[in-house]
Amino acid sequence: DDDARTLTIVLKQAKADLRKDLAYPVFVILDVSGDYDLAENPIGTGPYALTSFDSKTKATLVKNKYYWNGEVPYDNVEIDFLSEDNKAMALQNGDVNLVENITSASDLETLKKDDNFNVSIGQGVRCGFAYINEKGILKDDALRQALQMALDHKTMCEVTVGGLYTEGISVLPSSLAYGYDNLKNPYEFNTDKAKKLLDDAGYKDTDGDGIREMNGKNISIRYITYENRRLSDFAQAIQTQLKDLGIDVKIDSMNADKEWNLMVAGEYDLCDSNWITVGNGDPTEYL
């Protein structure tokens, strides 16, 4: 209704979280009969309108004079796409006014100590995942269970990435009140128990090289990863901890697209990813 400036949405079935979905940036309202190139010319409803876009370097925006929710504070906004290693430096050099998602604990500590900057850290709903391929070399239950028991997630979160993560046991983050505190990890960290599991299953180091064997060959696992929010740091920590168990881990680092394709194809032993799990605030999105 143009006069009343209202929109009526008719659904095929009830959807309690519809309003949250409409506010989630992943969802876009479009005319289905239109012809769009959203990858290069996105259409939004926010306070700024896109004027130029380069997926590798920068997005330039201007004030949206039709914005529905009051005065827009800035006439122009430039968003630079920086690597994780360059964000803090760009801020310190005065090249940018604001940065988000600094994932280096050392960079954050440096900025905290500098009175020229305000550092804000909050709990989010993003989770880091490690996936185990239950086919191939890791098809044996005992081997998979031992791997999980051999990993000290608490130390990885507190030391490896400087406390930027919280140890997780669910796809739902601890920052939400969805009963997370009642969950129990069935594979609590216990190196001795993990080693006994492998010994009892017959996976032993018979030649003294520090690596256990399966069918006469060293157990070597391929771990695929990509550089995002310290995933590579976790991969290296897992590699180190599993070596103590007697398992060799080969890390194969690549871009996110290649890793995703290999994961879908099942061409990995271990892999990781990093996702916002409840973007609209409703856990049913991920269940």
Positions of the model-derived regions?
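Ligand-site clamp/hinge motif
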Residues: Y36, N64-E109, D248-K250
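Gly/Pro-rich hinge or "lid" segments in bacterial periplasmic/extracellular proteins
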Residues: A14-V72, N76, N86, N190-D192, ...
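A ligand-binding cleft/hinge motif common to bilobed small-molecule-binding domains
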Residues: I102-D114, T277-D282
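Append "and occasionally in soluble cytosolic enzymes with long acidic Gly/Pro-rich linkers
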Residues: K139-T240
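Short helices/loops that flank or line small-molecule/ion binding pockets
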Residues: D85-N97, K113-D114, A142, Q236-L245, ...
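Short, well-ordered beta-strand elements
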Residues: L7-I9, G46-A49, A59-T60, D75-F81, ...
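Periplasmic-binding protein-like
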Residues: S120-I132
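Acidic-aromatic pocket-rim loops
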Residues: W260-L287
